[in-house]
């Protein structure tokens, strides 16, 4: 195992300075950025990992155990965590070395306050989910002491796993056009990361390309209640005289609320607008709703598997430079909207 003393000898700096930097205390001790970069580069080159053997043994775990932190935002996305967690667990079960997952909830824009991430004293590596613009800026400006993988985000210097968000929106618009829709509304919450904006941008561009008129978007809460209240309000006002032919929802939760509101108002069967959601909720909930919900499916479980693979690859030295993986997405037609044509599906 590589020691702090060996790193100090490699770069010609005192062991105490190396310890401060690797412990995440460089800023408060006013250690220069150049010195920090030298230390982190040497640590990566030599294969240094935080020594948590004693901590693990005190907790009843073996010294060989890897501790991987999962940082997840404390907001509307908390309910989506289970699918991601299931993907992590499925991949970890295939590994020979024991891995312990630890969840660290955090508040968007305040990732920099997570000492477990900046100190490197509590985990060997981290997977960061739901990072905001401010959080990504913090990551870009900071040299962290442990390997980090980003879920559905891109940031210079970090490994990441993503999907094509523009295509997610485009697939929904194409499906509506193929079903003969001429007008479409959007139900989504305020964007908290670039991918949300890209989905709506892709939807608008593809829709306009196919002659689909996109109605003015008004944000709603990203929840079942939010979708229900948004549709109920519109049915009393701008949709009172004329419904849109189609509705694109930014999440499964919003869509389920929307379906409930339409049903209560008597819009069922052929009276119901075509409806597609970004499929980020439990697949069973989408498949067994009434009507069953058509989605552009977000492959969260597969993305989680790729995240843990990147973590383990960095820890064992197989991955030494930032690597980004782009996973495929698909449109899953169900009762709320029909399939793509053969041409559009290509």
Could you tell me what each predicted segment is?
Residues 236-346:
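Flexible loop/turn connectors
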